[in-house]
Amino acid sequence: MDFSNKIGFLGVYFNKFTIKSLVALILGFRGRYITVVTPNVDHIVRLNSNLDFKKLYQQADITVNDSRILNLLSKIAHVDIGDVIPGSDLTRKLIENLPCNDYPISVIGASDETIKFVSDKYNLTYLHHYNPPMGFIDDAIEVNKCIDFVLNNPSKIIFICVGSPRQEI
């Protein structure tokens, strides 16, 4: 699938999706994997001052705008970067539209309480969770634990919820 149709704004190239079309694409995707990022204004500032961070965003298959402020700026500049799709809204819509409650999902980050709440609310039976300790990104052993967790828990969706910029690295 070709996701190369992107619109550049402030050094980032955005795909234009509605939340409905993006959820359908993700849940219907049959390829190996796709990477979706949802930058907000803080991310834009950071990636324009950090080349390594910017490369990570450039490598993402799909980039959608997470920020109403960014949306307003794009309108002022007469650049249509698509709908505002906050990562939290996308996550909720994905879970609400899962084809079955045993759809394999993995989550890195978030508290045990949050995972239990989501699992109970949506009756998810195949939800794997690992919450690395604070500062894990500077500890090769902990980073490898995250990688091993993903490899040992095959899932159709993997949510990385450890905060920027750690989740991008």
Report residues per predicted region.
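Periplasmic-binding protein-like
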Residues: 156-162
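Short acidic/histidine-rich motifs immediately flanking catalytic phosphotransfer sites
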Residues: 66, 153-156
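Conserved acidic residues
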Residues: 61, 105, 156
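Loop/helix-junction capping segments adjacent to catalytic residues or to phosphate/diphosphate-binding pockets
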Residues: 47, 137-140, 165-168
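Conserved beta-alpha
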Residues: 71-149, 153
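Short, well-ordered alpha-helical microsegments
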Residues: 114-116, 166-169
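N-terminal nucleotide/polyanion-binding subdomain common to many enzyme families
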Residues: 1-91
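Structural motif
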Residues: 39-42, 108-112, 163
